[in-house]
Amino acid sequence: MAKGQSLQDPFLNALRRERVPVSIYLVNGIKLQGQIESFDQFVILLKNTVSQMVYKHAISTVVPSRPVSHHSNNAGGGTSSNYHHGSSAQNTSAQQDSEETE
């Protein structure tokens, strides 16, 4: 659980801090838009004309309207090296898998 939080907390925090508009897609296909006002382990408070409490288990995807710097600055370090973007992360993973099987 802590591993998942180490990825999502800095990302959501950057979106909240920088007041980046986001689109949140729910698992049922509904698209919500607004700014992340707050969040905890289970919910995200999304503000638009009103504030909505959105349960994380209902969220499929969070899409920022612009790129954000979401690397962790905590004393534990190392977290930022775990971030991967786009196909390069998939290629790296596939390459590691093929090296392990040889």
Swiss-Prot record:
<keyword id="KW-0694">RNA-binding</keyword>
<keyword id="KW-0238">DNA-binding</keyword>
<dbReference type="GO" id="GO:0003681">
    <property type="term" value="F:bent DNA binding"/>
</dbReference>
<dbReference type="GO" id="GO:0003677">
    <property type="term" value="F:DNA binding"/>
</dbReference>
<dbReference type="GO" id="GO:0140691">
    <property type="term" value="F:RNA folding chaperone"/>
</dbReference>
<dbReference type="GO" id="GO:0043487">
    <property type="term" value="P:regulation of RNA stability"/>
</dbReference>
<feature type="domain" description="Sm">
    <location>
        <begin position="9"/>
        <end position="68"/>
    </location>
</feature>
<feature type="compositionally biased region" description="Polar residues">
    <location>
        <begin position="70"/>
        <end position="96"/>
    </location>
</feature>
<keyword id="KW-0346">Stress response</keyword>
<dbReference type="GO" id="GO:0043590">
    <property type="term" value="C:bacterial nucleoid"/>
</dbReference>
<comment type="subunit">
    <text>Homohexamer. Interacts with H-NS.</text>
</comment>
<dbReference type="GO" id="GO:0045974">
    <property type="term" value="P:regulation of translation, ncRNA-mediated"/>
</dbReference>
<feature type="region of interest" description="Disordered">
    <location>
        <begin position="63"/>
        <end position="102"/>
    </location>
</feature>
<dbReference type="GO" id="GO:0003723">
    <property type="term" value="F:RNA binding"/>
</dbReference>
<keyword id="KW-0963">Cytoplasm</keyword>
<dbReference type="InterPro" id="IPR005001">
    <property type="entry name" value="Hfq"/>
</dbReference>
<dbReference type="InterPro" id="IPR047575">
    <property type="entry name" value="Sm"/>
</dbReference>
<dbReference type="GO" id="GO:0005829">
    <property type="term" value="C:cytosol"/>
</dbReference>
<comment type="similarity">
    <text>Belongs to the Hfq family.</text>
</comment>
<dbReference type="GO" id="GO:0006355">
    <property type="term" value="P:regulation of DNA-templated transcription"/>
</dbReference>
<dbReference type="Pfam" id="PF17209">
    <property type="entry name" value="Hfq"/>
</dbReference>
<dbReference type="GO" id="GO:0040033">
    <property type="term" value="P:sRNA-mediated post-transcriptional gene silencing"/>
</dbReference>
<dbReference type="GO" id="GO:0000049">
    <property type="term" value="F:tRNA binding"/>
</dbReference>
<dbReference type="GO" id="GO:0045975">
    <property type="term" value="P:positive regulation of translation, ncRNA-mediated"/>
</dbReference>
<comment type="function">
    <text>RNA chaperone that binds small regulatory RNA (sRNAs) and mRNAs to facilitate mRNA translational regulation in response to envelope stress, environmental stress and changes in metabolite concentrations. Involved in the regulation of stress responses mediated by the sigma factors RpoS, sigma-E and sigma-32. Binds with high specificity to tRNAs. Binds sRNA antitoxin RalA. In vitro, stimulates synthesis of long tails by poly(A) polymerase I. Required for RNA phage Qbeta replication.</text>
</comment>
<dbReference type="InterPro" id="IPR010920">
    <property type="entry name" value="LSM_dom_sf"/>
</dbReference>
<dbReference type="GO" id="GO:0005524">
    <property type="term" value="F:ATP binding"/>
</dbReference>
<protein>
    <recommendedName>
        <fullName>RNA-binding protein Hfq</fullName>
    </recommendedName>
</protein>
<dbReference type="GO" id="GO:0008033">
    <property type="term" value="P:tRNA processing"/>
</dbReference>
